[in-house]
């Protein structure tokens, strides 16, 4: 799925998404928590809320969400500022993909000066295509979101 237009992953105010609460609990119960530290399990809730709100926005606007997955973004960047830890975030991401609720397209490594990438849409050189990972809801999650009371 290639879209020239994407939205950046954002930590929305969870209170603005009350309709997602039941879906949140349903999905949270299915996330594997065995052999995971208590601190990591505690952070999974906030990460899941962030993913669900972004997937809902992606569903409503029909565009993928791009997100940073570099360690530096968790250590001193955006995620650190909004108190989202790397390990719970990645475990929730993996679980959503395994549950068949989210599509995930990993980003490409940063390009060097000599590397080129060709856009699948235009066929022209594009050094900026795909640097960030992208997520969007699967048809299964879209069906679940459509059934919610808005």
Which residues fall in each region the model found?
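Electropositive, intrinsically flexible nucleic-acid-contacting patches
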Residues: 1-44, 50-150
């Amino acid at each position: 799925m290639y879209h020239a237009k994407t939205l950046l992953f954002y930590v929305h105010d969870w209170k603005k998404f009350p309709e997602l609460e039941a879906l949140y609990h349903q999905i949270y119960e299915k996330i594997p928590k065995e052999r995971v530290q208590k601190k990591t399990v505690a952070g999974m809730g906030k990460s899941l809320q962030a993913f669900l709100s972004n997937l809902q926005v992606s569903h409503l606007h029909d565009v993928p969400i791009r997100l940073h997955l570099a360690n530096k973004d968790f250590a001193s960047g955006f995620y650190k500022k909004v108190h989202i830890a790397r390990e719970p975030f990645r475990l929730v991401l993996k679980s959503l993909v395994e549950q068949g609720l989210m599509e995930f397209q990993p980003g490409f490594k940063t390009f060097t000066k000599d590397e080129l990438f060709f856009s699948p849409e235009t066929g022209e050189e594009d050094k900026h295509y795909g640097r960030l990972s992208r997520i969007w809801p699967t048809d299964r999650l879209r069906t679940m979101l459509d059934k919610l009371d808005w």
